[in-house]
């Protein structure tokens, strides 16, 4: 998972299961402009299935699906 912002702003990157339960917060801070932020998520302890990551910034919310299959 990665993101890059065009201007400095507060960013929150979270992983959720499909029931809406927060699984993990990966980032919760001010993100610098033009910096590339990359995260590795270890889902080895989670059951197989579809999960969501949500990036919330001062200007937008982006939600994407991903799968865990062991």
Where are these regions (language model features)?
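Interdomain boundary/hinge segments at the C-termini of tandem beta-sandwich modules
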Residues: 68-70
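A structural signal for beta-strand boundary/capping segments at domain termini and interdomain linkers
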Residues: 22, 61-63
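Glycine-centered coil/turn sites that cap beta-strands in beta-rich domains
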Residues: 1-15, 37-41, 60
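Terminal processing/anchoring signals of secreted or surface-associated proteins
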Residues: 1-3, 20, 41, 51-53, ...
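Short, surface-exposed loop/turn motifs with a glycine/proline- and acidic-biased composition
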Residues: 27-58
């Amino acid at each position: 998972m990665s993101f890059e912002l065009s201007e400095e702003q507060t960013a929150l990157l979270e992983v959720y299961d499909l029931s809406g339960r927060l699984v993990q917060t990966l980032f919760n801070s001010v993100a610098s402009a033009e910096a590339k932020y990359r995260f590795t998520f270890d889902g080895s302890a989670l059951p197989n299935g579809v999960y969501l990551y949500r990036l919330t910034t001062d200007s937008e919310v982006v939600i994407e699906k991903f799968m865990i299959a062991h």
